[in-house]
């Protein structure tokens, strides 16, 4: 008697269906289903016992699974009904089984070994998936499925775990005093109070809401999350090529969206406040890349100077700052939410764009993470060197615009 026939003979001291018997040998050979392996193993045991004058009792009801595999078509139909309620391009099956079944399976393995065995849930997932794939004409996707259909085999109940929808784009913020993301009221923490006129928000709207609300509505999702490549100050505009972002829509019922129409819808509803460009499908991996990116940025800054500064001196000072590294202690204005650390940042390039009475306009490109306002006014000596100190005259930022995000991380 071969080792595998011996193991099958030992396994059949319990009344097992062909699926549960064959699953003991799931890793032996290729090209067969577990059901086929089980039939073959059963025939081998019948011959072996027959040679000893013994008879294998006829199969009645599987001791291990209770003949659960007879219900696989019913489970598959339940999955198809559930999946028909949402738009998806692919799927994956998961299952729950009675804990007693798993306990019996482990008992079987302890007797006959599990080196070549496969768990019952793996076979159920595969067999249900094969039927759904054929009937629904949608492929199984193991790595990044649009939806996981979780079948509770005790009740033939199906729960759907719908993957988020990710959409990449770039936004321009054409006005000041709009935050990038929803900002809960500091007084009530979003519950609603007199301070926030019972909206629960510090600001009436945000880039996230102007962009995310229309997409969520069209996708019929339950919520949205905004992942930006950094963020500008609330009082700064974001112009030029726009800031990259990925919007994440939770539990979307629709996935195949007309992004060109959505772009127009967002820009129309933005009402000259927010524009989006280049909407396209994205991924969780691109969210990670977007949030981790640290691109240089180019700014246009209107500076008020308290004192007389001639253009020649100003140009000389600006020239001296090119490729200069500055040290910035955490600014006072953000010290309540940032650790008090000294950070070195590079002023990559800067030049004078315009000069007037008591003010000038500066264009500068800086390393990611540079506090531009503090570079201008010095933050009471917490940023050095700084423009005010170099000019010998106090300077303040009147307005600041981001005019380019110099990134190269976008997926093509």
What kind of region is each of these model predictions?
Residues 1-412:
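Non-catalytic RNA-recognition surface used by pseudouridine synthases
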């Amino acid at each position: 008697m071969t080792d595998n026939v011996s193991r099958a003979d030992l396994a059949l001291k319990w009344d097992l269906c062909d699926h549960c018997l064959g699953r003991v040998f799931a890793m032996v050979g290729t090209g067969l289903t577990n059901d086929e392996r089980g039939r073959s193993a059963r025939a081998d045991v019948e011959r072996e016992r027959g040679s000893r004058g013994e008879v294998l009792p006829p199969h009645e009801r599987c001791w291990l699974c209770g003949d659960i595999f007879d219900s696989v078509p019913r489970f598959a139909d339940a999955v198809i009904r559930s999946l028909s309620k949402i738009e998806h391009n692919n799927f994956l099956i998961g299952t729950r089984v009675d804990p007693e079944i798993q306990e019996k399976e482990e008992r079987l393995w302890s007797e006959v070994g599990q080196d070549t065995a496969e768990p019952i849930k793996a076979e159920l997932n595969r067999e249900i998936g094969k039927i759904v794939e054929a009937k629904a004409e949608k492929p199984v996707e193991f790595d990044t499925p649009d939806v996981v259909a979780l079948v509770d085999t005790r009740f033939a109940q199906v729960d759907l775990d719908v993957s988020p929808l990710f959409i990449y784009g770039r936004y321009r913020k054409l006005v000041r005093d709009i935050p990038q993301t929803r900002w809960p009221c500091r007084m009530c923490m979003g519950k609603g109070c007199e301070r926030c006129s019972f909206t629960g928000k510090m600001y009436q709207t945000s880039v996230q809401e102007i962009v995310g609300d229309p997409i969520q509505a069209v996708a019929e999702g339950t919520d949205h999350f905004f992942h930006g490549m950094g963020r500008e100050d609330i009082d700064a505009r974001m112009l030029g090529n726009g800031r990259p972002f990925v919007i994440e829509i939770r539990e979307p019922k629709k996935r195949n969206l007309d992004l060109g129409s959505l772009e127009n819808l967002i820009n129309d509803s933005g009402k000259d406040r927010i524009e989006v460009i280049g909407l396209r499908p994205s991924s969780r991996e691109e969210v990670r890349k977007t949030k981790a990116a640290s691109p240089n940025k180019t700014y246009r800054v209107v500076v008020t100077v308290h004192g007389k500064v001639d253009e020649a001196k100003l140009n000389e000072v600006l020239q001296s700052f090119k490729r200069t590294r500055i040290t910035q202690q955490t600014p006072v204005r953000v010290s309540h939410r940032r650790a008090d650390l000294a950070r070195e940042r590079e002023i990559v390039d800067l030049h004078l764009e315009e000069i007037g009475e008591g003010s000038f306009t500066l264009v500068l490109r800086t390393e990611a993470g540079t506090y531009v306002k503090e570079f201008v006014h010095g933050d009471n000596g917490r940023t050095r060197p700084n423009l005010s100190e170099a000019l010998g005259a106090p300077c303040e930022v009147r307005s600041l615009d981001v005019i380019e995000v110099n990134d190269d991380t976008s997926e093509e």
